[in-house]
Swiss-Prot record:
Gene: rplA
Biological source species: Halothermothrix orenii (strain H 168 / OCM 544 / DSM 9562)
Single GO term (MF): rRNA binding
SUPFAM superfamilies: Ribosomal protein L1 (SSF56808)
Family: Belongs to the universal ribosomal protein uL1 family.
Protein name: Large ribosomal subunit protein uL1
A biological process term (GO) from this entry: translation
Length: 235
């Protein structure tokens, strides 16, 4: 077990580990106990009642957070001709084709999102071993393999994030920074809960949203009442 520092231990004392907090109270507490000397990310962890070994229960997709992530997102685009121009005008940081692929093969990975037009996938596919393990491979399921580059680039810049359930049924997502007002964190929180509820697989049995936890980068987890999280959407 890793030992936590003094700040973490002090923060942990302020959290009732037996209590299920309301979403608003949990987010207030995350902000209150954040003590690092940088703007910590606020993370949301949701455990779903799914078995990812079954393809139809592999919950996956992408969502645009209405208040953004608070992070500057570097976007690269694989495209040629008019589509390359469209990507540049939409605000992509780097646009290229074979030259960009060679740059990545050489070890350059200074970006957060990679987007490609479908006709470029013969080039991008060869980067699978590099981009795949880092979660950077363009994928049509999350809208990063597309001819609609203006929308894809602007969504990525605005705070579009991908999610995918892990082998234990957990999904981890950033919902902003501790510097965000609670109302902004709540709006992002609600958006993700809403998306996950809509994505419930028809074959999932029993309770779907089993646990919800929020935390800051350096802080302890704060348990949220899943029923209250769901009620935010059903009101």
């Amino acid at each position: 077990m890793a030992k936590h520092g003094k700040r973490y231990q002090e923060s942990r004392k302020k959290v009732d580990r037996e209590k299920l907090y309301s979403p608003a109270d949990a987010l207030e507490l995350v902000k209150d106990i954040a003590s690092a000397n940088f703007d910590e990310t606020v993370d949301l962890a949701v455990k779903l009642g799914v078995d990812p070994k079954h393809a139809d229960q592999n919950v996956r997709g992408a969502v645009v957070l209405p208040k953004g992530t608070g992070k500057e997102v570097k976007v690269i685009v694989f495209a040629k001709g008019e589509k390359a121009k469209e990507a540049e005008e939409a605000g992509a940081d780097v646009v290229g084709a074979d030259d960009l692929a060679e740059k990545i093969k050489g070890g350059w990975l200074d970006f957060d999102v990679a987007i490609a037009t479908p006709d470029m996938m013969s080039v991008v596919g060869k980067l699978g071993r590099i981009l795949g393990p880092k979660g950077l491979m363009p994928n049509p399921k999350v809208g990063t393999v597309t001819f609609e580059l203006e929308k894809a680039v602007k969504d990525a810049k605005a705070g579009k994030i991908e999610y995918r359930v892990d082998k234990n049924g957990n999904i981890h997502l950033p919902i902003g920074k501790v510097s965000f007002p609670v109302d902004d964190l709540m709006e992002n929180f609600k958006t993700i809960i809403d998306v996950l509820l809509r994505e419930r697989p028809a074959s999932a049995k029993g309770r779907y949203m089993r646990s919800v936890t929020v935390s800051s980068t350096m802080g302890p987890g704060i348990k949220v009442d899943p029923n209250q999280a769901i009620d935010l959407i059903r009101k």
